[in-house]
């Protein structure tokens, strides 16, 4: 096995859109409105339209005078994301959206309807620089970071689609957000944290989704995990571990060459200690690569030692990607792996995978037009 791409932590600075309302916190919104010569109360009025009514077109904000709509449209609502296409499966209850940003950059998000929740998987970067060889996004390389507004607007658009009954299953409410789409969220740290705050703040400052229903994933950027722990947020941390030993992880997750397993688990323990939140560990099970019984035993033992009862393992059957030489482990092997991890005192379940047939499942997002 070889790594075909280098790790990229510093994204190209090209293509970022102009300032948008969703890039700004409450104080910055008021300052931006004042710069336009408008009274400060307009800032909350505009924010209530965007976050509360899920309206992104100033021309439709009819409680504002027409001249104000034109003014704020030019200053605070640059073109962000246009739908290229929707693709659905699961009787329409799983819907992947391909977006085109203002500079032509392509990205994807996936909306999944369940009996008890509606979950949106969002992208934080266009592409990914972490170069994991079993992931289509990682093998495509990194185009650029997404702006805070580009991240937030994926959520606003999905919430509006659910509210309006545009997704199979009738009108509904968006309840859960997972930063598990394209990109390494903690490599776009500042914008992702700002987006989390906008997504979770109550209107008029945000979309009002509970922090406890937000998951931020990472391949293991240990210093950023510790930094996130100190942000005062209550989001769930998901660590994409994929193997408990450094020898294999150096290849499967190349960032392990910088922050090995022990360092990642130390950071995860700090996150659990600081936030009081249980950590999720993601494990893509690959036939004859990381599915051996001894690896299950090692995984359970290391996680129990590092995190005790504050960890849960999600086993993910490997999703196929174009040209991949790997495939998912057989079901008996998967069941034995889960059993052995549980035997070590660590809760372990197989994650319900949605969207495989439309290339919308974990590791499949490639933003192909």
Swiss-Prot record:
Residue intervals passing through the bilayer: none
Active-site residues, record numbering mapped to chain: 108 (proton acceptor), 362 (s-methylcysteine intermediate)
Subcellular location: Cytoplasm
An individual GO BP term: tRNA methylation
A GO molecular function held by the record: 4 iron, 4 sulfur cluster binding
Protein keywords: 4Fe-4S, Cytoplasm, Disulfide bond, Iron, Iron-sulfur, Metal-binding, Methyltransferase, rRNA processing, S-adenosyl-L-methionine, Transferase, tRNA processing
Residues binding S-adenosyl-L-methionine: 183-184, 217, 240-242, 319
Reactions catalysed according to its record: adenosine(2503) in 23S rRNA + 2 reduced [2Fe-2S]-[ferredoxin] + 2 S-adenosyl-L-methionine = 2-methyladenosine(2503) in 23S rRNA + 5'-deoxyadenosine + L-methionine + 2 oxidized [2Fe-2S]-[ferredoxin] + S-adenosyl-L-homocysteine; adenosine(37) in tRNA + 2 reduced [2Fe-2S]-[ferredoxin] + 2 S-adenosyl-L-methionine = 2-methyladenosine(37) in tRNA + 5'-deoxyadenosine + L-methionine + 2 oxidized [2Fe-2S]-[ferredoxin] + S-adenosyl-L-homocysteine
Disulfide bonds listed in the record: 121-362
GO cellular component: cytoplasm
Record EC number: 2.1.1.192
Major site of localization recorded for this protein: cytoplasm
Domain spans labelled Radical SAM core: 114-357
Pfam family, one: Radical_SAM
SUPFAM superfamilies, per the entry: Radical SAM enzymes (SSF102114)
Enzyme class, broadest EC rank: transferase
Cofactor: binding details: Binds 1 [4Fe-4S] cluster. The cluster is coordinated with 3 cysteines and an exchangeable S-adenosyl-L-methionine.
Requisite cofactors: [4Fe-4S] cluster
UniProt keyword annotation of Disulfide bond present: yes
Miscellaneous comment text of the record: Reaction proceeds by a ping-pong mechanism involving intermediate methylation of a conserved cysteine residue.
Protein name, UniProt field: Probable dual-specificity RNA methyltransferase RlmN
């Amino acid at each position: 096995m070889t790594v075909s791409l280098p790790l990229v932590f510093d994204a190209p600075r090209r293509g970022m859109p102009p300032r948008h309302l969703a890039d700004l916190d409450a104080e910055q919104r008021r300052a931006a409105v004042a710069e336009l010569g408008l009274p400060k109360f307009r800032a909350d009025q505009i924010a209530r339209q965007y976050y509360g009514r899920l309206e992104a077109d100033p021309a439709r904000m009819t409680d504002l005078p027409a001249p104000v709509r034109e003014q704020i449209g030019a200053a605070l609502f640059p073109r962000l994301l246009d739908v290229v296409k929707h693709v659905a499966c699961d009787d329409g209850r799983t819907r992947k959206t391909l977006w085109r940003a203002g500079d032509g950059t392509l990205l994807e998000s996936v909306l999944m309807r369940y009996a008890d929740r509606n979950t949106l998987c969002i992208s934080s970067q266009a592409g990914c620089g972490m170069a994991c060889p079993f992931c289509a996004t990682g093998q495509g390389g990194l185009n650029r970071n997404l702006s805070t507004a580009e991240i937030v607007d994926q959520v606003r658009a999905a919430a509006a689609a659910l509210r309006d009954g545009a997704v199979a299953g009738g009108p509904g409410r968006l309840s859960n957000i997972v930063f598990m789409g394209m990109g390494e969220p903690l490599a776009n740290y500042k914008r992702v944290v700002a987006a989390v705050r906008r997504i979770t703040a109550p209107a008029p400052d945000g979309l009002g989704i509970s922090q406890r229903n937000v998951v931020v994933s990472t391949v293991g950027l240990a210093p950023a995990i510790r930094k996130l722990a100190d942000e005062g947020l209550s989001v769930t941390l998901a660590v994409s571990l994929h193997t408990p030993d450094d020898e294999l992880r150096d290849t499967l997750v190349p960032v392990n060459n910088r922050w090995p397993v022990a360092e990642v688990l130390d950071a995860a323990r700090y996150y659990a200690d600081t936030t009081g939140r249980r950590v999720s560990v993601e494990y893509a099970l690959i036939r004859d690569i990381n599915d051996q019984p001894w690896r299950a035993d090692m995984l359970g033992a290391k996680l129990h030692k590092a995190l005790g009862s504050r960890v849960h393992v999600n086993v993910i059957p490997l999703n196929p990607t174009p040209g991949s030489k790997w495939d998912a482990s057989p079901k008996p092997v998967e069941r034995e792996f889960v059993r052995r991890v549980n035997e070590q005192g660590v809760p372990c379940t197989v994650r319900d995978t949605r969207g495989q047939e439309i290339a919308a499942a974990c590791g499949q997002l490639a933003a192909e037009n």
